Structures are given as structure tokens and as C-alpha cells.
């Protein structure tokens, strides 16, 4: 009841009682049907708590509120926006990102799951088995509106076939290079050597810019692809130029600072 009272005068104007429950008149704001706020037994619905939570966010003047929903909950978005309209709340800074489902594969076989039968594989299970970093890397690799096939065997593989391992190995190589040489990042750089590795240097210089761009676009998958591309470029250059040079030192130092 405190939640419903928190909606203020709007609650009185835009609700009605039906079959012992209290309903919100969201159809007046382009929702496909009115929504229950309080059940017959007086218990609040998830909808009421979500509306109250977002109202609190809006009232506290948050710059941005990002909601991440499963794609199967896309119908929930108009319900919430209708509630904001009912309350005459500006919701321009509230964003909704929809993510598709994840399919787990082990030994080439898709793992079947059913909540009804109590058969499922939790994220905590994956974390214990693989560690959090590799999970984040693979889960962020796909664009949110694309389904994902997560290969558990590939995630465990310690070879260049595993993009996460390959990216880590690039960082290890950077650290190894810096540990073997004395390098002052403020010293003059041999421009001829820079010309020979323009691609890798330009990627390093552009990293802060693309990071900001990906954040504003809400596209973490683009950052993962940038890391994969940079790692491949670095490994290729390293293998072609095994001898320490100004370019390798400069790039390694920059990569270490930005990792």
C-alpha cells in the first residue's frame, strides 16, 4: 500500500477496483490492457514495484536509467512507459535494451533446460566452472538482438582458437616486452619505425575515442570486437618483428595503460 500511495494523486485518478483488485488505467496511454497494481489479497504485483522503482529513479533526477530485459519480455516496455505517461513523468532518459537468449553447448551438444522440470544451468554454475572474465567476454561478444551459442569447451581452450585467451596473451606479451627493456614513453620515437607499424599505433591511439563511442551507443559487443582485432594485429606484428623496437615499446606501454 505504501508503494501505491507513493504514486500520489495519480493513483486516485487513474485506478479503479475490479474483482477485489486495484487496476491502473494504462489503456488510456496506448497500453493494450489495464494492469493490476494490487491483487485481491492486497499483495502488490511485480508491475507496481517496477513502476514505483522507476518513479523513484525519475524523482531523484537520474541522468540515465538503463533497463536490460530478456527479449521475451519486450511486451513489458509499453506497460512501463504507459505508467510514466499516466504519472506525467518524462521518461526520455529511461532506456530499454533487449537481449536474446543464450544457448549452452558442451562437447558439441546443446544443453537442454526446463524450469518446469527443474533442469537449468545457472550463471553462478558457469562462473565457478570458467571464471567471471571469460564469461563476460563471450557474453558481450554478440549484439544484444542476436541469439548466442556459448561453447563451453571453447571458453576453456587455452589456444588462439579461444578469442578470450588470445586477447589475454596479447596483454601478457605487452607486459613481457616492457619488463625486458627500459623505456621512457616521453622520449622521442623513431618515426620510420612508426611508419612500419602505423596500423597498430593508430588502433592504440584511437582506443579512448572508440571506447567513448561504444559506451554512448550501448554497444559493448563492439568493444569486444575491437579487442579481438587489436590482439590479432598485435600478435601478427610481434611475430614479424620479434626484436625490441621503439614501436613495440610504445604500443605495449599504451596498451598496458589502457587495458
Residue ranges and their predicted role:
Residues 2:
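Cationic, low-complexity basic patches in intrinsically disordered or flexible, solvent-exposed regions
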Residues 5-8, 12-252:
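Non-catalytic interaction-recognition regions
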Residues 253-259:
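A short, hydrophobic C-terminal helix/tail in secreted or cell-surface proteins
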